[in-house]
Amino acid sequence: MLIDGLTVNTCPVGASDGVTLRNVKSISHPGWGDGLNVFASQNVLYDRVFCRNSDDCTTAYASRKGFFGNCRNVTMRNATLWADVAHPIFIGIHGNAERGDTIENLHYENIDILGQAEPQVDYQGCLAINCGDNNLVRNVTFDNIRIEQIEQGSILQVKVGYNQKYCTAPGRGVENVTFRNIRYKGHQPYLSIVNGYSEERKVKGVTFEGIKINGRLLHDKMEGKPAWYATADYIPMYVGNHVENIGFSIP
């Protein structure tokens, strides 16, 4: 299915296979005004889309709102996202907690994020994975993303957690996440977070390649960084418990 050239309020994709949205604009103002949501679908492509939303701009969830199953093979490219509150990109919080769903193979490329203004710490992160409901989130790539001024919020969050307001179980884990060529220019954002839940529900394998904060390229051997400082401090980012294999490099 191809949807081309429409201007919509919200436009969710649920229980679908093989959907392309091209040249679509999503503009919303009410509460819960998410833009382009994906529920329990696969092989979904967003190309040349614009989102100006009063809640999350785009999401990738598993079972939710009467749609049941895994979510995989979702790509968004050549996009502009602007969230009033909540997240420009949000992944992972909803699924079937009894069965345990999988959200995998997500790719976000060549995206401009114009802002985030979210005062609630647990819902910050322009690039956010909040894994709940016994979901497993894996193989996620954020590539060539430019973030402008953040009014309130952080650059990223990658968490396995148990948000009892919206979930009935913690997530199973997050694996293999790549942040490549991410650029932020503005005043210092709030603290980014990478954090697992337990020894059985970890964050594993988070790679940062070519990250620039206000023009400074961050990597583990960058000039001027004391050897005892964590590279994550320069985002700034807190790396918490139950996190394995996190590293910064030059692509």
Whereabouts are the PLM-identified features?
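Extracellular/periplasmic carbohydrate-active domains that bind, remodel
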Residues: 1-251
